[in-house]
């Protein structure tokens, strides 16, 4: 069954943030079909980014086994490679929600005729925990958006809403405040690891991270180790993934601010 990380990201996944109502309609097809349709429409062009459980991607792979050769690249935020988990002692959240799906996806890419450079890039906890957002980063982001704001602080009352003038910066600050508070309450400091944004950044530029080829399998039957990403670094078997092992954290935040700041300024009606 589907589980939501509400203790960290709030009941709707956006912390304290509230999005304006949308006039967009739900599509007449599901997410698995969307993967397949897009891949067929743009063969060899698209970069897939998976930042949650891999259920829909596994279903897409069942419908179209050639998906690994139809995509230009795949980046997955998930797993923990020679590192502790965040759901159990050894399992990461996204993989733990549907480990069977993760196993299918890795097996599908491993069995496909994919050159090593196009193997999935896996951004696990050992990588994403090196990229932690702080209130200073949010202040820099507001400045890049030409938005006045009040810096977030661990001394603020829980749930304090953003004072930013820019609407997008308000959404980001309200979402991040919940995340920062959750980490602070867990004893991790007033910071928040940027798991999913890092995967998106890697999709844009894989050179942001150093990778190492490996063969990854998902433990499905262990009483204590279910959903563990079992990683064989020996090189004796064909690799099915490129594991992110290091990242330039400063470069990530510079790029994040350089892209999101001006976009927020445009959304807010600025220059």
Language-model regions, residue ranges each:
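A glycine-rich beta-strand to alpha-helix segment
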Residues: 40-62, 71
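Divalent metal-coordination and catalytic microenvironments
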Residues: 52, 105, 200
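A glycine- and small-aliphatic-rich helix-loop capping segment at beta-alpha/alpha-beta transitions
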Residues: 8-12, 62-69, 93-94
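Flexible, glycine/proline-enriched loop segments at strand-loop-helix junctions
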Residues: 17-26, 44-51, 86-96
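Conformational coupling and interaction surfaces
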Residues: 96-100, 114-271
């Amino acid at each position: 069954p589907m589980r939501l990380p509400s203790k960290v990201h709030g009941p709707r996944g956006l912390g304290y943030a509230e999005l304006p109502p949308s006039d967009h309609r739900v599509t007449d097809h599901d997410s698995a079909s969307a993967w397949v349709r897009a891949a067929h429409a743009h063969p060899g062009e698209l970069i897939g980014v998976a930042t949650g459980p891999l259920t829909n991607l596994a279903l897409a792979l069942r419908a179209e086994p050639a998906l690994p050769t139809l995509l230009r690249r795949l980046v997955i935020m998930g797993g923990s490679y020679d590192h502790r988990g965040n759901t159990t002692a050894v399992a990461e959240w996204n993989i733990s929600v549907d480990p069977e799906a993760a196993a299918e996806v890795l097996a599908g890419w491993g069995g496909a005729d994919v050159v090593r450079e196009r193997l999935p890039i896996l951004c696990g906890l050992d990588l994403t925990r090196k990229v932690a957002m702080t209130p200073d980063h949010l202040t820099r982001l507001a400045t890049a958006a030409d938005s006045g704001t009040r810096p977030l602080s661990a001394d603020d009352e829980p749930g304090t809403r953003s004072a930013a003038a820019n609407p997008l910066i308000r959404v980001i600050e309200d979402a991040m405040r919940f995340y920062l508070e959750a980490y602070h309450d867990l004893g991790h400091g007033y910071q928040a690891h940027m798991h999913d944004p890092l995967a998106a950044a890697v999709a844009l530029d894989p050179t942001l991270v150093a990778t190492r080829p490996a063969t990854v399998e998902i433990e499905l039957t262990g009483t204590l180790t279910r959903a563990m990403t079992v990683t064989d670094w020996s090189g004796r078997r064909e690799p099915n993934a490129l594991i992110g092992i290091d990242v330039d954290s400063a470069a990530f935040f510079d790029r994040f601010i350089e892209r999101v700041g001006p976009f927020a300024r445009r959304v807010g009606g600025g220059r």
